[in-house]
Amino acid sequence: MFGEQFEAAVKKREKEFATYDEVKVFFTTWNVGGFEPSKEYDLSGLFNNFEGKGTPEVVVFAIQELVTKNATNLITSTTNEAAVQKWADIILANLKKHDNYLFVRERTLIGITLFLFVKNSIRERVQKIGADLIKTGVGGNFGNKGSVVIKFCIDDSSFALINGHLEAGASSNSTRLMNLIDIHERAFQEEGVGKIRVSKCVI
C-alpha cells in the first residue's frame, strides 16, 4: 500500500525532477550475401522515409554475411577489416547526404556486423559505449553462430542493440531460445578480447 502511494506521489511531481526528449532511431537489417559494393554505392532507397519526417538521431545497420563464411574464418573467427571499413564508409557517405552523421562504433563476428551512427547534434549526449561479441557455435567456441552487441546511453536512457545469427529451421526453436538466453547472460559479463568499452562518444 505504502509503495503504491509513494509511486503515485513521485509520479505526480515527476516534472519537477525529470525532463524528456524524443529520440528517433532508424534500425535496418540486411543480408548482403558477401556483396562487395563500390565506394560510390547508392543507398538512397533505404532512406526514403527520412524526407519530410525529420532525420533520426540514431541510425543502426545490422548486416549479415558481410563476408562469406569459409572453413578458415569459421574456426579462427577472423574479420575482414577492410570490408567492414568499406561498408562503414559507404553507409556514412550516404547518411551525410541527409544530415551531419558520425560513425560511432561497429562490432563484427565473421560476417555479422553491427554499425552505430548518430547525428553530430547529440554526440555529447552519447555515453557509456560498449561492444561485445558472443559465440554460440559448437559449445560457444566457434563464431559460425552467435551475435554482436552494442550498448550506449543517451542522457539517462540506455540502449542495447543485437545482431545475431542463430540456428535455422522450425525444428531449432528451442535451440534459438537457449542461444538468446546465453547471449543475454554472457554479454558484457566478463573481461576479454570480445569486450570494448569507452566512456563517451569519441569521433
Each model region followed by its residue ranges:
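Hydrophobic beta-strand segments of well-ordered beta-sheets in folded domains
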Residues: 57-60, 160, 201-203
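Structured beta-strand-rich core segments of catalytic domains in phosphoester-bond hydrolases
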Residues: 73-167
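N-terminal, active-site-proximal structural segment of metallo-dependent hydrolase catalytic domains
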Residues: 1-108, 112-115, 172-175, 179-184, ...
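Eukaryote-biased recognition of electropositive, low-complexity segments
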Residues: 125, 132, 140-144, 153-155, ...
